[in-house]
């Protein structure tokens, strides 16, 4: 069988693409995922269903690729990537915070106006059901999208959360009611996509809407070795994928091949397929299909620093309570990048809680 669309990776992007493309009943869609699939919320493993992406239960999980990188010459750092339907949205910290408008506008200035903040706002809204603003979503919130977003009301805040807010306000920072509004800065409730404590991944939000469709085939536990190309013309054309399922290798044909395997695996698959720096490919015995020096280069990620205090004995640090409820966004002194700093108050420690 030749599929109309083959999607490599059922993660944050792939699950959405599969759902949207399969809306056309005349198109066949194959969604490939290297990790397992859990069709029902009740069947999700605990570390996928709950958690904050920081405990050993997720960093050592079989649902995490457990990639490492060298932050310095002397130390390795973890690079968590999801290996399950939902991808990294199934193992993340559920912080549903939009990017800075300036960043999107900078992308637009590079040549594509469609990436400006104003152009993207309708798509931000389309993704979400923001329960805080569901009755009056206005211009900057969604009321009927697949991903559920909420904020903890003030009367549910923990003592440490109240203390954090007071300290920030006393330091002169403003209060921010809505951190997802354009131009927002200061301290206030943090938008989260974990209603009732459940990590609301794209596997739940999007594949939950589409997995019943007869024109959508979801194949978990299938690893893609490479994309296949027809090189007889002037420009290489992707025609299929070579995959491993069980211990067998298969070739699957498709009219369109969509690579959405994440920030690490997507360039890896491209290079294994012959797309990348030709000198680097030749070192590994891979024939070059297309020389592109940037593939697998220039990855940037945000650093994080933990500062820990021991609280007074009378302070409630019940591990079953929510950990992160509010946040501070601000601009570092001397920086020309708006809101380039963010601070969370992690209000509890202990075993992974099932928390709302």
Question: What name fits each language-model region?
Answer:
Residues 1-356:
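N-terminal redox-cofactor-binding region of secreted/periplasmic oxidoreductases
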